[in-house]
């Protein structure tokens, strides 16, 4: 296996964030412009500008804050990762829509955002509050989950069962709202499930899966906890449609401290109901801030502290390692990696 660069493009301006999908790379510049590269033709165009004349108490969208860019089939979204603001734009229909979420605990919570296809149309998952995400049909610009409750399925039954054996000291109204902070969103290749890499008070990392069709149609929230850990991992990716790869440090204690390098990080494979299916040990690689993606049965991991690795759960081996290569984005639709270094964007493939 080897990495091969298939295209490069010089960029004018300072790149603040970059994303890729559906054969396009899109990036946010420090002046607020969002540009895109057609990886087939090499054409570069300005997609839209995040600048606006409206004044916000918090300053509005900040092009120089940590941000993320998402691309899917003619749609581009850009959000401040730990802020309130974002935008989604349609390349074909020439519109852009402002996004804004509630400010509660946003400094610790990645802006939930993701695209998927359903019934031939692109849909968007986006956060509105810490425990509330919506799903919209972008073709119709219609929010499909406008009537969805923030209460989980079976909440009343669990409340009654719990207080059969416990004193109800606080006398609060029930059922209570969903007690979960949605985080970074990942979507399965078939669009049937999405994963939230979020957290719950404790604070514990919690990777939770949802069926997209059920989330749209069910008035209550039905969740499946894939993984929970103590300050360990708020990242993961689908490996196929029915499993999730998660970086795990086995010896992290209840306070978020680990035993150093003696016990290495692992990348584990979990079913959507939380059953551990496989694990591969990765000595010498600190995966605390790793990014993960998967295609063709391989899981790719990269980060500034260790470079790049490809893991095959079928053989239980690291099948490729490069300490110098560190992508800035990944096109899951085509299996392309995107680098952004020294004013040049590169498109790479693994062969």
At which residue positions do the language-model features occur?
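Short, solvent-exposed linear motifs at loop/edge-of-secondary-structure regions
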Residues: 127-129, 163, 169, 173-216, ...
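Short beta-strand elements that form the blades of beta-propeller/WD-repeat-like
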Residues: 23-30, 67-81, 86-87, 120-128, ...
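Flexible "stalk/tail and boundary" regions
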Residues: 12-17, 24, 33-38, 76-79, ...
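Repeated scaffold domains used in trafficking and secretory/extracellular systems
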Residues: 10-20, 53-73, 104-117, 180-185, ...
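Beta-propeller domains
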Residues: 198-207, 228-277, 287
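Blade-level signature of beta-propeller repeat domains, shared across WD40, Kelch, NHL, RCC1
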Residues: 329-351
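Surface-exposed loop/turn elements that mediate protein-protein interactions on large endomembrane-trafficking
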Residues: 1-10, 32-58, 80-107, 134-173, ...
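Long, hydrophobic, well-ordered secondary-structure blocks that form the structural core
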Residues: 110-115, 121-135, 141, 145
């Amino acid at each position: 296996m080897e990495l091969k660069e298939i295209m490069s493009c010089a960029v004018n301006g300072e790149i603040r964030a970059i994303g890729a999908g559906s054969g396009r790379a899109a990036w946010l510049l420090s002046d607020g412009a969002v540009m895109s590269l057609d990886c087939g033709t090499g054409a570069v165009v300005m997609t839209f500008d995040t600048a606006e004349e409206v004044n916000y108490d918090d300053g509005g969208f900040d092009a120089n804050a940590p941000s993320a860019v998402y691309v899917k089939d003619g749609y581009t979204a850009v959000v401040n990762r730990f802020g309130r603001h974002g935008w989604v734009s349609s390349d074909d229909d020439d519109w852009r829509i402002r996004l804004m979420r509630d400010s509660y605990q946003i400094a610790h919570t990645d802006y939930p955002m993701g695209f998927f296809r359903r019934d031939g149309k692109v849909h968007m998952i986006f956060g509105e509050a810490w425990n509330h995400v919506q799903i919209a049909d972008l073709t119709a610009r219609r929010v499909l989950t406008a009537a969805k409750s923030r209460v989980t399925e079976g909440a009343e039954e669990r409340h009654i069962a719990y207080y059969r054996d416990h004193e109800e000291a606080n006398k609060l109204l029930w059922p209570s709202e969903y007690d979960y902070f949605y985080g970074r969103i990942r979507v399965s290749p078939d669009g049937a499930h999405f994963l939230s890499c979020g957290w719950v008070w404790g604070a514990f990392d919690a990777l939770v899966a949802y069926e997209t069709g059920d989330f749209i149609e069910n008035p209550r929230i039905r969740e499946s906890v894939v993984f929970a850990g103590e300050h360990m991992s708020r990242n993961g990716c689908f490996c196929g449609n029915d499993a999730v790869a998660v970086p795990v440090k086995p010896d992290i204690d209840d306070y978020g401290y680990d035993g150093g390098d003696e016990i290495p990080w692992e990348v584990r494979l979990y079913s959507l109901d939380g059953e551990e299916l496989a694990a591969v040990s990765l000595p010498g690689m600190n995966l605390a801030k790793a990014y993960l993606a998967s295609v063709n049965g391989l899981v790719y991991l990269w980060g500034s502290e260790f470079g790049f690795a490809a893991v095959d759960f079928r053989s239980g081996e690291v099948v490729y390692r490069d300490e110098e290569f560190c992508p800035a984005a990944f096109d899951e639709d085509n299996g392309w990696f995107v680098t952004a270094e020294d004013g040049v964007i590169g498109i790479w493939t693994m062969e």
